[in-house]
Amino acid sequence: MAASRSASRISFAKIIEPLEVPDLLALQTQSFDWLIGNDIWAERVQEAIDADRNDVPITSGLEEVFEEISPIEDFSGSMSLSFRDHRFEPPKYSVEECKDKDMTYSAPLFVTAEFTNNTTGEIKSQTVFMGDFPLMTPKGTFVINGTERVVVSQLVRSPGVYFEKAIDKASDKDLFSCKVIPSRGAWLEFEIDKRDTVGVRIDRKRRQSVTVLLKALGWDEARILERFGDFPSMRVTLEKDHTSSQDDALLDIYRKLRPGEPPTRESAQTLLENLFFNPKRYDLAKVGRYKVNKKLTLEVAHDVGVLTEDDVVRTIEYIVKLHAGQDPDNYEVDDIDHFGNRRLRTVGELIQNQVRLGLARMERVVRERMTTQDVEAITPQTLINIRPVVASIKEFFGTSQLSQFMDQTNPLAGLTHKRRLSALGPGGLSRERAGFEVRDVHPSHYGRMCPIETPEGPNIGLIGSLSTFARVNPFGFVETPYRKVENGRVTGQIDYLTADEEDRHVKAQANTPLNADGTFAEDRVLVRRKGGEVEFIPPDEVDYMDVSPRQMVSVATAMIPFLEHDDANRALMGSNMQRQSVPLLRSEAPLVGTGMEARAAKDAGDVVVCAQSGVVEDLSADYITVMHDDGTRRTYRLAKFRRSNQGTCINQKPIVFEGDRVEAGQVIADGPCTDNGEMALGKNLLVAFMPWEGHNYEDAIILSQRLVQDDVLSSIHIEEHEVDARDTKLGPEEITRDIPNVAEEVLADLDERGIIRIGAEVSPGDVLVGKVTPKGETELTPEERLLRAIFGEKAREVRDTSLKVPHGESGKVIGVRVFSREDGDELPPGVNELVRVYVAQKRKITDGDKLAGRHGNKGVIAKILPVEDMPFLPDGTAVDVVLNPHGVPRRMNIGQILETHLGWVAKTGWQVDSGAEGWKERLRGIGADAAPPGTNVATPVFDGAREEEITGLLDATLPNRDGQQMIGSSGKAELYDGRTGEPYPYPVAVGYIYILKLLHLVDDKIHARSTGPYSMITQQPLGGKAQFGGQRFGEMEVWALEAYGAAYALQELLTIKSDDVVGRVKVYEAIVKGENIPEPGIPESFKVLIKEMQSLCLNVEVLSSDGVSIEMRDTDEDVFRAAEELGIDLSRREPSSVEEV
């Protein structure tokens, strides 16, 4: 157990941040709190009202949906059903029980439903059960059927009105267009063509003159000319318009929208009303109304979701003014990729939309039942069918693109997954259609979405990560905080701005020098204006200032020290690879961190945090009991060796002692990849940058045997194996120790039930759970059944279908879970018993494993050298890792070099003398002028240790036990060759780098096969490790053997080793009997080819050398003939392993 020590770091930061990093899971938790309308949300609403803020929506998500759907009326309007006051009962099972028993963590939802008979005025009220509603765990995840899932927030185009400009290639004219995009309903599009006429498209149909629409809305020509007469484009349009009255215009629109149907004035009027002015059919949503009001400077109430006549007229006015080039400051086109025009659909909204969908389906059922049931007998319960609601929620969590299997490789992976922003998914973009502009970094992303962290590959730029300080406002727009500047002085006020609000202001950066009173230290300040333009201006023109230098990057990127010295492409890889790092046997916090580690570990939720202050009363490896100051006790259970979604090991261990005083919010137990409450993804290793015999060519890595022996980079991986016993047509399967034709030693580790004991060492092919399945072709007669019942089961024929350890896997059994119908466990239909076995492996580091630093510097281990052969320092310390210096210059990730030097300084400790140099003064000012050996340091992104400070500190490091300082200001040491003891001719850069072991382990990739499964049609071996397939011998490999004239090897590869079915059986027997291998026959794929050609009516025949047609019999005949001749039982499948052979 680790000693309780505080995780303090000496920070090289020069800027004091005015704002704490916010709760990193707020994106998920606050959204879900709003959806279900719980107490936490109610408190936030009250706080916002008291402080006169409007940053919290005041109606909960479910309340909104029930209000929208109420009342449901029947077709005549004589009856109605309305919903109000939803409430949740406590969940039936805890999160842990749900994970254990494959259940969904959910709470029952109840709603008060009122049925009103409008003719008699009678009201019947009932509380109705609306299904189990999945709940979010405190960590921001959902447990669905026992697995943890995350709902990713979606980036979509906001509803509103958008103006665009295109240039006509022929005439070189500016063509303007405009779209009014609702949250749901028909699109309305306006456009001005090259002949300067203004057109309109309704619901993506054919273009018409815009004046037709205005006339249909009741405007006459005089009124149109009075409002738009100054614009030539509108006059031209009016001249070309052939309609004379409102009726003509309505009929004209109807013909375009419903071609082929007979138009009448009433139907045309209704159609237009329904398209844009009926709340049931058209909804801009609150956000759409907000955007329309803002763009067109209207004052329409926020709850008006339909279009108004004013909206249409102002939109036409805007587009013709754009075309005429009037007032360009106030009339401008929109940029669709701007973050003011893209919004987030967070978890709450995504689930709310599903509930809305389910309720809409339910509404149809209710209406039908109202008409079919007897009015007297109707109660709310008889009308409501909750199936569609439950089904749509279930469908969303089970199959939606945005409900994802949680990435639990390490805590950072989980945290990042919850903060992910995706432009994909239903209603979003698709990979194929997304162009370059959507994916590119935009100036409005600053402080909202990280410009660095995004996947490499087809999803680049479509999936991002929320920036550290960003938050989401009630409309779904991402806001970022700024410090208010008034009259050239920074105030204590902090404002959260959306991207379009920010565009109206001038912002200074966080590292702008300030005086003690908050005024700017320099007479010119570097600022950012609209569109990311940069300039120097006087301090009194500045409106805002960034709150922190790490404001623009995400959590993972903010954990890369010296990020400012890395090329962005490599920083991207560094951010992504931190998420693939495997929890090691012993975690170790980085010597060189960024100050973000503790916060990230705490918010990720894999550490145990004390809820109230008190004293540790009792603790063991499994629990910690704290006696709180108010006299109450609380026991915190710790997770021991649990399997994560990715097969890594989740294990928590206490970091406090009995009797220790603990405060609320203090970390009392470490989880995976945490050390003393700090994120610890890798190990601090001594690295030398030098080529070594060509073994570290092209990013290969050389390691010391010490890392293998001392388990420095060893990790535990847990695999889950499962088997179920079902009812079959021939009788039930049985889990038993009594397996036919199996030697007793194979069953030695099975208990009396036939299940492996905990602690057993298992290797490929070992039986984990014994199971037999009845075999035979006939159903049993009642007489036979009776005989069986009397004389026992022994007589019947069964086959062995036991659960065995798959190929390439081995380890120790650490857990067994048995579920059976008899014990009352819920199991799928037809399953009587289910057994799960957990097998743990300790994987030492080995050649072929992938290692990486935090700067995108990755490589595969090529050679593990004995410690005595490794290069060593003058005091005899052998280095742990040898990296190739050629990997640094062209990749431009110099951060790794600075980390190497600062890592050495932190490991050896330092003492700065009392000199008057600037860097010494600076370090004294921030209390970083001295530190003992092994001190952890923080160098925050964009505000870290400077080059001159590192150079100075290298000179000021403490001497070793021999009194020597092995590395000077150059950062290089004299290294000695471990094999000869001779010094290398040049000094070598040596220091400590934080190295991560990634999930790409060679054990999971290496694969070999002797015999195994074959493809049904071609009879060739399957491909890939998952199918236990063979190695593909492709056409280029065939050319190689042809070139060498290796005819016999080639013949074997293409026939008996692949798909010559008869030959395979013959060779198998020849090997068993020790005879010579017979001649190969005809490959199955050749027969398939001939059949394909014959199916195309090409008569292909095989002729002998003298021209006689040879008949090729079907595969089945050949095989069975051969099998009969050879006496081989072919009723079983092909052997799939050496053991079976």
From Swiss-Prot:
One of its GO terms (biological process) is DNA-templated transcription. Keywords: DNA-directed RNA polymerase, Nucleotidyltransferase, Transcription, Transferase. It catalyses: RNA(n) + a ribonucleoside 5'-triphosphate = RNA(n+1) + diphosphate. GO terms for cellular component: DNA-directed RNA polymerase complex. The keyword Transferase applies. GO terms for molecular function: DNA binding; DNA-directed RNA polymerase activity; ribonucleoside binding. PROSITE patterns: RNA_POL_BETA. InterPro entries: DNA-dir_RNA_pol_bsu_ext_1_sf (IPR042107), DNA-dir_RNA_pol_bsu_external_1 (IPR019462), DNA-dir_RNA_pol_su2 (IPR015712), DNA-dir_RNAP_su2_dom (IPR007120), DNA-dir_RNAP_su2_hyb_sf (IPR037033), RNA_pol_bsu_bac (IPR010243), RNA_pol_bsu_CS (IPR007121), RNA_pol_bsu_protrusion (IPR007644). The RNAP catalytic core consists of 2 alpha, 1 beta, 1 beta' and 1 omega subunit. When a sigma factor is associated with the core the holoenzyme is formed, which can initiate transcription. DNA-dependent RNA polymerase catalyzes the transcription of DNA into RNA using the four ribonucleoside triphosphates as substrates. Belongs to the RNA polymerase beta chain family. PANTHER family: DNA-DIRECTED RNA POLYMERASE I SUBUNIT 2. This is DNA-directed RNA polymerase subunit beta. The gene is rpoB.
